[in-house]
């Protein structure tokens, strides 16, 4: 299911993504035929939100000694007051509530994109616990720019509001 979500939300060439899944390489960056190549998704500077998300994952692991999934990280970022957050002391983290300006669905989409970008890993054998990858740790130390893809609005849903202006990707 997670891989289907990643496929649906990915901003790159779908042909290349499918071939990669089956162990083949697509020689071009753009097939010119899939929905993403015909209508590239908007991108935006997601550096600040990526740093917040990655920092939250790091601080939860450091405080608790164990990892958690995307949902719990989102709850901490948005300042939710759940029994688990209070029990584990995650309401005392510096990242608690720093993302309250965004909806939970937005944070969940950001978390999934950080996994796709290789900044976080998920272990399906361990309830999809998030772990910082070496690239994610490097990003926290170096403050490199992170470009995220704006999610496509689903019929009947409002389009998410992000804090940075977006620009149309022409890859």
Short names for language-model regions:
Residues 1-3, 11-19, 26-171:
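Accessory DNA-binding and partner-docking regions appended to nucleic-acid-acting proteins
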